[in-house]
Each structure stands twice: as structure tokens, then as C-alpha cells.
């Protein structure tokens, strides 16, 4: 199989290089080392042909294998004895283009591999054997081979390039390759076609992708496919590292935009999204401004500031409500206590009062299990009577020291039931009978 492919790719009937065959041979050699060895043997055989075109195509195929596969091919070239064959062709003063191509290939390869101290010094030896023999050609400036690895050029890309080249045939390939165009011009035209097709696909509604089938869009897709082939050819043949790097990147972008068009035609893209796809294009209808790192940081800071501000306001409001509840609680509790006392029956006054409640009151269990007023510190216990005087006014009889006023008070209030006041006022003082602080709040004002 390998020998047949090499024979077909180096046929003397070809008017120009069959890039489709060359790419297929590169893939075959990269997959299988045995096939790679057979390919090199077949190339060596074709180098012995008397037809200069066959020799030139064989040298170009060998150059492509060296640049894209690398070490394995170099080993096979040395083991198979291809280098002495190349040196012999140059010394024989055969066709000039073949001799020059071989000489430049040996020069570039031995330089890239490190010369005499490199991994394959055989290339250095073969090159300087020609130099010592007086062979000399006009060398290209900075002529170094560009190694395009399998990672840089995906295999599916090579397959698609192969399929397109097969469909177009040798005549189309010959016509395109015969045009000597600078790498910058090729890259510029391919970039222009890419941008135009991108804008057209951005305007296509993914829910109704009929716009992807019109004649104008299909022409753009065909143009991008053509430019993709030219870019791929540039990757394979150019020795300008910068141009090759740009061409590889542009080839990937062209492949993505073509895949996107196929997705639209097949209906795999159903919902428009504002997210950016892996190829850097937005799938929604409106252009989306890319967000830089600075914008993201500013938006994050603003979001954090808003969150902190709202949290701070919420905490302030919550604390304010709690303070208002604490301020209103004693007054409301006192009113509830008085209301409960007014409903209490006389016989309830003689019953033992609970330790933390009031007899006959309608206070909830939670209120019964908490003190009426928080206990005061020890140094403020003596001022408890004064603070209690600030509560709502209560009619209190004069102290026993003022006996005359006390008797007069009881006589005046004897008929209106005020004598029962001391009993009903139990639990409203901060001090017990012995003057100590108490949480029960039960005290008798009578003597």
C-alpha cells in the first residue's frame, strides 16, 4: 500500500505536486512505523528514477515527512541509506532544480538538528561532503525547516484537506499552486473571508436557519474552504515560522466557522446563547462586548458593595426593631399586669403565688418564666426605690412614722375600696420585705 501511494504521488505524469497524496502518505507514516519504513524505501527507489519530475516529487515528499513526523523519519532515512543516494544525485550534476532542492534540504535539516553535535550528525556529514566537493547554490536567508507536529495540525484537518483535494482534482491544485502569492497575502485574504462569513452566520436565526442555505452564504462557505486549502498548503511549504504559526491558527478558525455552518444546516444549534464559543464567536444575534479582567473586577466590587450595603441596612433595621421592642416591653407588660390584677378575684390573693408570676394574671407561659425587669447591679440596688417612683402614679399610704397622716388616709379611703390596694399591688416593686433585690417582684406595702 505504501509503495503504491508513493508511486502515485511521484508519478512522472503529474504536472505538479499532488498534495492530497502527500498528506495521505504523511498520515499513514505517522500511524504505523512499519508503513513509515516502507514509505522511505519507496522514496529511495523513486529517487533513482531517470525522470527529473519524479525525483523532484520524491524530494518534496521526503521534505514533508521530515518536517511533520520528525525523529522516526530521520531514523528511517539513515537506516535505509537515503542520504548517500541524495549526495550521489547532487554530485552527478543532474537536473538543476532537483540538485538545489536536495542541497537546501540537507542544509536546513542538519542545522535544525544541531549540526555535528546533534542527535543525527549524519545529515551534517552528508551536507559538508557536498560543500567540500565544491557544490554551491544560492541559499535562502535563515532557511530552517519548520516542524509542524501532529498536535499543531489536527488529523481531522488533514483528512478534510485530503477530501477536498481529491474532489477538486489535480488540475485545480495545479492552477492554484502555480500562482506565486506571498504568505501575508494568503493570510489576509483568508482572514477577510473568515470575518465576512462570521458576520453572516451571526445574523442567521438559529431557530430558523434558512439564511444559512441561501446562495450568498454558500458562496462564502466555498470561498472559506478554498482559503483554508491555501492556508494548509502554506503550512506545509513555508519556511517562515511566523507565517506558519499564523497560518495554523487561521486554519483552526476557518475549520470552526465551517463546522458552525454545518451545525446550522443540520439544526444542531437550536437555542441562541450569549456565551462565547470556543472559537471566539458569539452565537447570539446581538454583538456581545468582551469583558476584560478590569471590567470583571469592577463589577465584582460593585456587586460586593451593594451586598454589603443591603446587609448593613437590614442589620440596622433589625437592631432598631429589637431596641424598640425592648423599650416598649416593660410598659406594655405593666399594662398587662394591671389588667390581670383588675380581673383577679379576692380569694385568689390568699393563694400562694408562683415564684415568677402574678396570681390571677393572664400572662403567657413564656412571660411567666422570665423576670419582669432585669436585675440591677449591686451598687444600684439602693436606688431601686427611686427608679420605681418613675413608674405610673400609684396611691400609697403614708409611712408608719407619720401616724396622724396615715390614720387620716385610711379614713378617707375606707369607703371606696382603696384598702385593698396593697394586696393588689403585690408584684410591682423591685424589692422584697427585707429590702433585698428579688426577681419574683412580690412585695406588700402594708405595715
From Swiss-Prot:
It is a peripheral membrane protein. InterPro entries: ENTH_VHS, GAT_dom, GAT_sf, TOL_plant, VHS_dom. Residues 322-331 have a biased composition (Acidic residues). Keywords: Acetylation, Cytoplasm, Membrane, Protein transport, Transport. It is found in: Cytoplasm; Membrane. Residues 9-138 form the VHS domain. Residues 437-447 have a biased composition (Low complexity). It holds the Pfam family GAT. It comes from the Eukaryota. SUPFAM superfamilies: ENTH/VHS domain (SSF48464), GAT-like domain (SSF89009). PROSITE patterns: GAT, VHS. GO terms for cellular component: membrane; plastid. SMART domains: VHS (SM00288). Belongs to the TOM1 family. Might contribute to the loading of the ESCRT machinery. This is TOM1-like protein 5.
